[in-house]
Amino acid sequence: MPATRPVLLIGGPTAGGKSALALDLAGRLSGTVVNADSMQLYDGLRVLTARPSVAEEARVPHRLYGIVPPSERMSAARWRDLALAEIAAAHDAGRVPVVVGGTGLYLRALAEGLADIPPVPEPVRAEAQALHRALGTPALHARLAAEDPDGAARLHPGDTTRVLRAWEVLRATGRPLGYWQTAGRAAPPPGLRFLTLVCEPPRDRLYAACDARFLRMLEAGALEEVRRLAALGLDPGLPAMKALGVPELLAHLRGDLPLEAATATAQQATRNYAKRQLTWFRHQIAAARRFDPGDCVERNAVMKFCVDNVTQIS
């Protein structure tokens, strides 16, 4: 058995070509695709989360897709444990794990280890969520800035998940999230060698892809998907209820927005999210091969790079 076993990591913005690349690489390398997108973990949101199709999932093994009910939350620590189990299973089966997704925190937690942050007690979490429902994300961000200006400065005022997380940790521990993130990390898993790719398409093409994909989602049944989600009567603060497109289409179903306005708003939210992802991957993932997956020459070079490197260490 070799001292290290290969794991491919593919990150980048939404609509940036990650899933197609992962499928191609898994086919070329006898691989198993492992999901690292926090929203594609949820069951019942195949269309709106751009999860691979049933036909695509049948081409090569896919793991950690649609495994969590929308009524639950998923932490980076829990995902990491599940991902490591799937990576080990893939290696034991003689396959190459291809971990793909736009949730950068998941990818970093896997490759570099996870900050040892104390768990947030449920009463503190519930209080924070109630405050968020009362104030909204920008106002909660302002409160965070008053107590943790450095941490708030690193967060977009509209990033609900990260603002709420920072507020919960501050309330639960009395220390900013940044303190725990720099206090030390759990060690990265031994015996693995990570090859990291970051998809970086040009922004104009990326934003056009975001807009076009949302229109395809509507044609593929996104509205019906959200109608089924709404029928579950879930807490609107749950992560699944804040997936891209869900709040806007819920507003349309309530009669608050015409479909055209809901579509435009969701497209703008998707472009904003893609922009934040581009920035995050550029500054937070250092050791990566970055490329434009829409450039055939670059894509072919990356495919060869992966095949050559996996061959060397498998």
Swiss-Prot record:
Region (Interaction with substrate tRNA): 37-40
Keyword field contains Magnesium: yes
BP term (GO), one: tRNA modification
Family statement drawn from the similarity comment of this UniProt entry: Belongs to the IPP transferase family.
Organismal lineage: Bacteria, Pseudomonadati, Pseudomonadota, Alphaproteobacteria, Rhodospirillales
Binding-site positions, ATP: G12, P13, T14, A15, G16, G17, K18, S19
UniProt entry tagged with the keyword Protease: no
Top-level class of the enzyme under EC nomenclature: transferase
Subunit-structure text: Monomer.
Name the record gives this protein: tRNA dimethylallyltransferase
Reaction(s) this enzyme catalyzes, per UniProt: adenosine(37) in tRNA + dimethylallyl diphosphate = N(6)-dimethylallyladenosine(37) in tRNA + diphosphate
GO MF, any single term: ATP binding
PANTHER family linked to this entry: TRNA DIMETHYLALLYLTRANSFERASE (PTHR11088:SF60)
Domain of life the protein comes from: Bacteria
Keywords, ordered alphabetically: ATP-binding, Magnesium, Nucleotide-binding, Transferase, tRNA processing
Residues annotated as binding substrate: T14, A15, G16, G17, K18, S19
Cofactor(s) of this protein: Mg(2+)
Entries under InterPro entries matching the protein: Dimethylallyltransferase, IPT, P-loop_NTPase
SUPFAM superfamilies documented for this protein: P-loop containing nucleoside triphosphate hydrolases
